[in-house]
């Protein structure tokens, strides 16, 4: 049911504004919908185009016309337990596993597959596709990724390793192997805690018992036929050094090929973490026969620094996530770590390099942001909206004289195209061809149905705004392209509200079979009444946890983007990979439009669709190889 978050009349001003908007339908013509509601313009802007700010004209670039990406040095042949080039650092992306543990970041199986394909374009060495034992849905998603992305070899022979996480028990390990074994390069990643606090309070086991479990489970994983086994001593940052030397030496003898050293609670400083890697290299028997990895949490904001410190000390695999998402404060950010190595690898890191095609960073970041509903903060390094903005007069003067004065990364390196036309004006007279050309320049390749829907929405916005900028277009495309598979589609909505009585909403939805359903409801505000009407149709209990709205551009005619976070009933649950507890899933939804009520309802319906797509007992269908968005 709709939350009391939306029943506060103070959310809206006393001014009543009547607008007309058009909802995208699946016919050839738009459907007019009128609504009357109170609107308080937001003071928050996700993309600012202030005239006093010098902003580099950047747009998302489509790297597909460019020649094939060639790393600074060739990617070494993949061998599980060693790397032939001592300066090559493997990139292990765990967005689909650890990143999805972020509250509200639940992904559908199709979204996971889309992201995995994009990660392969990015060139990550290992994709940790999930925790197969967590749920039927997670198992099927990992299996599908192994069958598809894990078997797609490019012209250079590159194919990512597909990894599944498991706890140190036979059931988890068998489940992980059953999911990843279809990949050309499958990996099992198993872990058990080693710090005193975890041994005493969580595991309730002695050090000797944990060593025996770790040794036997690594041996069991190898016995299944898996030649690539990664082992992690959970909470290594707080574990006794001598104990780490012992347990890691035992799992090496049992057949581990990669040893991952996690700073699970993000407590270490860069100097400490680098010294930990140095000590492990010097004192662990047989460590020269495996690859050392790092996994740094961001609880103290040091995950990127710790990861780089670990690499400098000799670790040759980095576990990271797109946009740094993850449990609690998140993980080391792929884009930050990779660009730091690209910028400084030769100068201060002894020549370290990766095989990442950095031109795909922005598109990958955008896809993860839209699918998870987790907005990237404007000042986020590398991919934030302000990453290439200069407002200070001194900085502006320097930038105009020479870009290198205040810019250490060229926007083109990460998939942004520097152009005087970012913010190009399209208007109501612009045609379908002009819109399609601009979408291509922004990095989007849409099919005819998607283009038709976007075009009608674009025309609607253009009728009400003098200028339609890239920010507007990106918001519209994201609202169409990055939506979950539709169980319910919003067709029409009519709102009556004001100061003279309760708000009333009439909502029309279409189900998966195309059957139309209509419901009316009253509430203490326009959004509250609309959400209640949706609940009457869907009949799926849901609690609204968060509701937020941002204006894409400035002005009263700005497009609004809405994000909601909901929680369903107990049947939408899975197993937490770290604690082993059953946790209720949360689901996010986003919507965009000039009508804030319409965008709010679209976000709510999107979250419900994502929740209802999360089915414990349904097999994952493998979609077409064609991506909805080509980067």
Swiss-Prot record:
Residue span of the annotated presequence: 1-57
Cofactors that this protein relies on: Mg(2+); Mn(2+)
Q: Name one GO biological process term.
A: L-leucine biosynthetic process
Task: Tell whether Plastid is among the UniProt keywords.
Answer: yes
Q: Which SUPFAM superfamilies match?
A: 2-isopropylmalate synthase LeuA, allosteric (dimerisation) domain (SSF110921), Aldolase (SSF51569)
Question: What does the tissue specificity note say?
Answer: Expressed in roots, stems, leaves, flowers and siliques.
Q: According to the UniProt entry, how is activity regulated?
A: Feedback inhibition by Leu.
Checking Pfam families in the record gives: HCS_D2, HMGL-like, LeuA_dimer
Top-rank taxon: Eukaryota
Which residue intervals define the domain Pyruvate carboxyltransferase in the entry? 89-362
Q: Name one GO molecular function term.
A: 2-isopropylmalate synthase activity
In its keyword annotation, does this UniProt entry include Plastid?
yes
Family to which the UniProt record says this protein belongs: Belongs to the alpha-IPM synthase/homocitrate synthase family. LeuA type 1 subfamily.
Assembly state and interactors?
A: Homodimer.
From the Swiss-Prot or TrEMBL record, give the protein name: 2-isopropylmalate synthase 1, chloroplastic
The organism named in the record is Arabidopsis thaliana
Taxonomy-wise, where does this protein's organism fall, top ranks first? Eukaryota, Viridiplantae, Streptophyta, Embryophyta, Tracheophyta
State the gene name recorded for this protein: IPMS1
């Amino acid at each position: 049911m709709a939350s009391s978050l939306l029943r506060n009349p103070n959310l809206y001003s006393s001014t009543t504004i009547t607008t007309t908007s058009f909802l995208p339908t699946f016919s050839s013509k738009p459907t007019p919908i009128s609504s009357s509601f109170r609107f308080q313009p937001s003071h928050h802007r996700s993309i600012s185009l202030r005239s006093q700010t010098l902003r580099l004209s950047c747009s998302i670039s489509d790297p597909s016309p460019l020649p094939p990406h060639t790393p600074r040095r060739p990617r070494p042949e993949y061998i599980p337990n060693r790397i032939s080039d001592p300066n090559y650092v493997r990139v292990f992306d765990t967005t689909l596993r650890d990143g999805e543990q972020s509250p509200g970041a639940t992904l559908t199986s199709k979204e996971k597959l889309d992201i995995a394909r994009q990660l392969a374009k990015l060139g990550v060495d290992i994709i940790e596709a999930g925790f197969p034992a967590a749920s039927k849905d997670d198992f099927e998603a990992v299996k599908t990724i192994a069958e598809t992305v894990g078997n797609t070899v490019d012209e250079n022979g590159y194919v990512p390793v597909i990894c599944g996480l498991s706890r140190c028990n036979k059931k988890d390990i068998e489940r992980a192997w059953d999911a990843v074994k279809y990949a050309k390069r499958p990996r099992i990643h198993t872990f058990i805690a080693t710090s005193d606090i975890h041994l005493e309070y969580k595991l309730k086991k002695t050090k000797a018992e944990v060593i025996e479990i770790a040794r036997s489970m690594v041996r069991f994983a190898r016995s299944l036929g898996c030649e690539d086994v990664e082992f992690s001593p959970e909470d290594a940052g707080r574990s006794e050094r001598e104990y780490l030397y012992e347990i890691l030496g035992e799992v090496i003898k049992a057949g581990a090929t990669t040893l991952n050293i996690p700073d699970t609670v993000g407590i270490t400083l860069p100097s400490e973490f680098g010294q930990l890697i140095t000590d492990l290299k010097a004192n662990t028997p047989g460590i020269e026969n495996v690859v050392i990895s790092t996994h740094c949490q961001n609880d103290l904001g040091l995950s990127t620094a710790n990861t780089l410190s670990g690499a400098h000390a000799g670790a040759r695999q980095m576990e990271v996530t797109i946009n740094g998402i993850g449990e609690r404060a998140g993980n080391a950010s792929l884009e930050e770590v990779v660009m730091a190595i690209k910028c400084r690898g030769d100068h201060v890191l002894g020549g370290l390099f990766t095989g990442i095609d950095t031109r795909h960073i922005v598109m990958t970041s955008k896809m993860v942001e839209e699918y998870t509903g987790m907005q990237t903060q404007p000042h986020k390094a590398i991919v934030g909206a302000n990453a290439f903005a200069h407002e200070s007069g001194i900085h502006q003067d320097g930038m105009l004289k020479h870009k290198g004065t205040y810019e250490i990364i060229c926007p083109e390196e990460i998939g942004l195209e520097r152009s005087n036309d970012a913010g190009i004006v399209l208007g109501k007279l612009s045609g379908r061809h002009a819109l399609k050309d601009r979408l291509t320049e922004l990095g989007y390749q849409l099919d005819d149905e998607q283009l038709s829907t976007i075009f009608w929405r674009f025309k609607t916005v253009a009728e009400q705004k003098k200028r339609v900028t890239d920010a507007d277009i990106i918001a519209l495309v994201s609202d169409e392209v990055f939506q979950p598979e539709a169980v319910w589609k919003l067709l029409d909505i009519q709102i009556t509200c004001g100061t003279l009585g309760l708000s009333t909403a009439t909502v029309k939805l279409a189900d998966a079979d195309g059957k139309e359903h209509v419901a009316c409801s009253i509430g203490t505000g326009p959004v509250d009444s609309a959400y209640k009407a949706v609940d009457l149709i869907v009949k799926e209990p849901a609690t609204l946890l968060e509701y937020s709205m941002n204006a894409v551009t400035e002005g009263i005619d700005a497009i609004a983007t809405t994000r909601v976070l909901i929680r369903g009933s107990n049947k939408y649950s899975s197993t937490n990979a770290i604690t082993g507890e059953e946790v209720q899933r949360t689901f996010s939804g986003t919507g965009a439009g000039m009508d804030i009520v319409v965008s709010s309802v679209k976000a709510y319906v999107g979250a419900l669709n994502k929740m209802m797509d999360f089915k414990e007992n349904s097999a994952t269908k493998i979609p077409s190889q064609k991506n909805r968005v080509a980067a």
